[in-house]
């Protein structure tokens, strides 16, 4: 049975990803791309659907004799996972990663730390989501002289066009469908295992050198993350009246930068704490002397001890509100950096696409039917990701995402899709897989049938992002501006059209306020391109359309009786997409109409935790019965709204709630089930992490 979603860690080589559980099992791995058919699919079924388990034997013992516990973390600013297993008094460290040096490989290294640990190793190779069991052959290695070399032995599994090669310091034996073994690791010993995918009409790839691959992969991740350095200190001013060089206009010190006279108190505080510690040691030494220790004790009587301890303790400065604020800021910066790394992990090096998630059919409601394939690329996700990569100086990734959008839209901008394949293909075929589903949640899908839906917000988001690129100095080329003009002309035909909203509901189509607002943003971007940047285009028509859509939204998308914006023209309900209205500049963050909309959201679609649902589904508007769970993306949009409209403390509180719901590695899925305290939905989700980055930026960190 699969682990809880929150127990999984992501490994990535920027072309595909794998999920490894806290129990040491890789239960999900698609090769060679994010959207390929799964090699390991136990996540959506059982062990016979494919997995790779590497863990202490005691951890899989139904009646363990010794206590087993784990500690895990990523190496700093990487996706190199390190898990320390403690088995009684003994321990081992398992290091796992996907090399960034080419190919499609998973590397797992077991290093003995203390004592002896017996490891259990099971390899169930599969193709086609567990349906195909490959023919596995063991090849005996030889050295340069032709003599047998057991260290070069390998297992090769093959079926049709697919093949896998497994190498290691100890190869598991067993029946054709599952290989298993045990081996003992002592302190100082190390075992390395690699699994590589390759096309069956090619030779197996060369062996991976563990130290070299580890060093290179770590350097690549850290080189990318080094572009983000949130902890830059303020430079010293030339005189006491001069403002720091990078202080914003108005002389405001950026949020999160601590400038306080209390910094001078730190040495005294530390000294006082040390004095208390020394007194404790003195008292302990005295007690040891009384019980026979040969350690000489300082001459401190009981009264003197208590007097000195009280004096020293009185000098200890309790953490201030500012201290707590800075601790929180440090957490937020760390969460933003991890989110940036998640974003990079989900951008395909091969195609430049951003995959929404590495998984399919993880249920938004456990046991329910809201199960979708997220191994696709949504235009809005790519557009919002470009804003992030551009802001953080990742020019290569910005160019990759930009070029992917242009290739995807070059087919026919007038028939824009919401969802595309990773190469920009339009594939609307959705099929059901013969898998049990995560905790029995059916159906299990391959493919996404919402691709042919028109979603006005996707068109608008793309044009807004290209406008941001222009503002940043990115020049238009022979393809980019003509495609944008085609999109703008197509948008003129979509004013007032019905759609199924950005939430892709299965209910009746309607005129969604958010979709129309994104058309407004598209026209506004087009007008600016001509008027402000001198590009050619029918600015007069686009300006007329922009103003007409704005009037329409303010008359039909705004409910005068409620005093707020509503989800659909003429409706009364609100949904989380309305939180994007100030993001695109249709209204100000603190516009009274927007504040009233926020209040309505709090009243109707908020969970007691402060997180919010996407919408109220009491009338089954999305085609399913019952309410889904609080939504990470929507909740983070609300947190940003709070911060930018002057409710910073509310924004921080909501951000804290969201971070508490992420897993121990800082990864988020689609939603969170508070009743069961479980992550739900596909994992990890790119747009959730993009939205978190926006919130931290709103705090000025």
Regions found by a protein language model. Give the residues of each.
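Acidic, mature catalytic/reactive cores of soluble proteins
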Residues: 1-701
